[in-house]
């Protein structure tokens, strides 16, 4: 075993203030995930089946970010969700897996003028991920940005960079309803993961911090650690635009929120993300996520406004 190193997550640090002449209204939150994909805000909605379908993707895109349509859908259903977003002339992404059958999904997605394809797995430093990346690169348009993940080390970053992806997604187990670190004992605290992955990136490849964002200040910390954008799940879940019905319980309103490694999500199709697709007996799934109720929050635009407002407040103190 390698020597144990100290590792940090967002809660372990704060950012030191700097001399600044910048006002919040003067701050630019624009970012590029590739030469083809520019965002007005550095926010992506997570490819989770209780977070992003067309309604969420449309709302996030209108605010300047991009939503990634989850893959716990049939190919036809996912294409339908993508078309709803593209019909509004908005940017949208779509998640794909690594199973051999997933390439058929990819072939249909690339016909939709998709802006972003995300190879969405729990372990991006693997041969299956490499295989699907090489296949996607052969058929995708130059206009489509290719992202792969998730990883947490510089070695994994070098691996994906050599394969020619545009963006790398970082995060092994930081999500609020992900239990990978408990079940498998695997993971790297998110801030340290970002700093390490950054060492393995070449200058052209961008980085997304995926998971662990609980406050707007965490976005600022992720960007300070080298991320070009963040992917958010729990903070956007429970909003009007998130999939699922509103549930009333003891006079309060809720929506269902679950990890893609939960039993419910794996039963719907995400078992492939955790390399358990070949397990025919669903009772033998080893879940790496949980499911529960999350407070209903209303329109997602209000949440995004608070997140970007907090980011601007941080940048006014840090930007010279």
Model-derived segments and spans:
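Alpha/beta catalytic cores of nucleotide-metabolism and tRNA/nucleoside-modifying enzymes
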Residues: 1-21, 95, 163, 185-209, ...
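Active-site entrance/lid segments in N-terminal catalytic domains of soluble metabolic enzymes
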Residues: 1-206, 234-239
């Amino acid at each position: 075993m390698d020597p144990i190193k100290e590792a940090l997550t967002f809660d372990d640090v704060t950012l030191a203030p700097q001399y600044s002449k910048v006002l919040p209204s003067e701050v630019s939150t624009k970012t590029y995930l590739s030469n083809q994909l520019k965002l007005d805000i550095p926010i992506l909605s997570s490819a989770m089946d209780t977070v992003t379908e067309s309604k969420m993707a449309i709302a996030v895109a209108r605010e300047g970010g991009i939503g990634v349509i989850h893959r716990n859908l049939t190919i036809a259903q996912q294409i339908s969700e993508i078309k709803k977003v593209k019909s509004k002339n908005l940017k949208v992404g779509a998640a794909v897996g690594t199973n051999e059958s997933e390439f058929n999904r990819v072939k249909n997605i690339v016909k939709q003028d998709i802006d972003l394809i995300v190879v969405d797995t729990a372990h991006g430093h693997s041969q299956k991920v490499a295989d699907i990346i090489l296949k996607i690169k052969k058929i995708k348009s130059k206009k489509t940005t290719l992202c792969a993940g998730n990883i947490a080390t510089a070695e994994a970053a070098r691996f994906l960079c050599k394969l020619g992806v545009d963006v790398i997604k970082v995060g092994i187990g930081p999500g609020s309803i992900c239990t990978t670190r408990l079940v498998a004992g695997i993971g790297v605290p998110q801030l340290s993961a970002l700093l390490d992955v950054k060492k393995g990136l070449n200058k052209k490849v961008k980085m997304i911090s995926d998971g662990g964002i609980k406050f707007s200040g965490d976005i600022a910390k992720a960007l300070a650690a080298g991320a070009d954008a963040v992917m958010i799940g729990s903070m956007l879940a429970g909003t009007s635009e998130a999939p699922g019905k509103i549930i009333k319980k003891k006079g309060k309103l809720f929506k269902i929120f679950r990890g893609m490694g939960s039993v419910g999500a794996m039963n719907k199709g995400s078992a492939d993300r955790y390399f358990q697709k070949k397990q025919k007996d669903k009772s033998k799934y080893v879940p790496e996520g949980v499911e529960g109720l999350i407070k209903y929050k209303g329109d997602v635009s209000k949440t995004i406004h608070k997140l970007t407002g907090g980011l601007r407040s941080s940048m006014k103190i840090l930007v010279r």
